[in-house]
Amino acid sequence: VFSGQKGNYNTDDTPDAFDNYGLTKISGEQIRSGIIIRASIIGRNIMKQHGILDWMINGKEKKASGYVDYIFNGITTLELVKSIEKILKKNKNPKNKKIYHIGSSAITKHNLLRIINKVYNLRKDITSKRAGKINRSLSTNNFFSPKKNIEQQLIEYKKFSNIIY
């Protein structure tokens, strides 16, 4: 829901996305009561393998380029499920709209690729490129965000996803 011009967005910030993806997310938030969870997810997709993790794992190239000026704070889908469970236990019948930001510490896409490369032992040469300063990080100072850093999350996710894939 955010353009990425500012970064470290909190739940009170006015959504300012201008692309179709962001605008559809904004329209989905037009509710009076319920829970809205904002997160950038990192995980595998059995049906469509086009996320950053699948791209790295399935890519045949020995090189991968990551943006050094694109910042976000993703969370693995496994950690997201744990956070959602906590939120649902706390909010059994929300009478008002509640917005939660869930994510890890902010990281560049370049550094995320380096961590994925290490955790999955891909042996790829990670190079840097520029996107034109984008910071879509969310302020996640809440009880529901994971205590594990993204590398720890990916290690746990890898063990878990080996059961499925």
Language-model regions, residue ranges each:
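Mid/C-terminal beta-alpha module of Rossmann-like enzyme folds, strongest
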Residues: 81-135, 165
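Residue-level signal for the nucleotide or nucleotide-sugar donor/cofactor binding architecture
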Residues: 72-75, 107, 138, 148
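Alpha-helix C-terminal capping segments
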Residues: 26-34, 56-60, 102, 117-120, ...
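NAD(P)-dependent short-chain dehydrogenase/reductase
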Residues: 18-19, 29-72, 78-79
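Short, amphipathic alpha-helical "lid/cap" segments that border enzyme active or binding sites
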Residues: 50-57, 77-85, 147-162
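Active-site YXXXK catalytic motif of short-chain dehydrogenase/reductase
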Residues: 21-25
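C-terminal amphipathic/interface module of NAD(P)-dependent oxidoreductases
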Residues: 122-165
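Active-site "gating" loop of Rossmann-like NAD(P)-dependent oxidoreductase/epimerase domains
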Residues: 1-19
